[in-house]
Amino acid sequence: IVGKTGAGKTALVDLLLRAHWCKRVLFLADRVALVNQAVNAFKAHLPDAAPVNLVTEKATDGRVYVSTYPSMMGLINDGANAEGGARRFGIGHFDLIVVDEAHRSIYQKYRAIFSYFDALLVGLTATPKDEIDRNTYSLFGLESGVPTDAYGLDDAIAAGYLAPPRAVSVPLKFQREGIRYQDLSDD
């Protein structure tokens, strides 16, 4: 799903949980800061879903789990390497995997996460890639350049999720005073 930043990723998960389309959701992000941001949003908007931050917590009783790709790979691999092979999450543990910022760093290295879990896969991005070695569309089995759905800026503004953009003029020093060669550093 192509959607602008701030257009309601938390709301999407909320709707799917309320509609009983899924019981347990794995929300993946590529940075710890995004994991923390998502956990805070889920706690604020979905407190009954008992969001679990898999980067810092070991709980397994939530409905929404949030993790980075490396943390989830570690959880999958650690279980496979453990004595007895008991994994923390079985292949059917999650009904839905939501991939935040799906255009970044998920192509070859972390594709094993999607192969391991038997779950529906939803990718969220504002800027899908359509390159030979990094194609967001092919990762989700889509025709290049054709997302499943797109939620544009105008739609998000009309629904009240986003404020309309506002241009602000910010005069910079070099625009006011110009640039003189002798003032430039060697770098």
What are these regions (language model features)?
Residues I1-L16:
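Walker A/P-loop
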Residues C22-K23, A49, H93-F94, F117-L120, ...:
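Short glycine-/polar-rich loops that comprise or flank the Walker A/P-loop
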Residues L12-H20, A38, I113:
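Hydrophobic residues on the short alpha-helix immediately C-terminal to a glycine-rich phosphate/catalytic loop
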Residues K43-G84:
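Inter-Walker segment of RecA-like/P-loop motor cores
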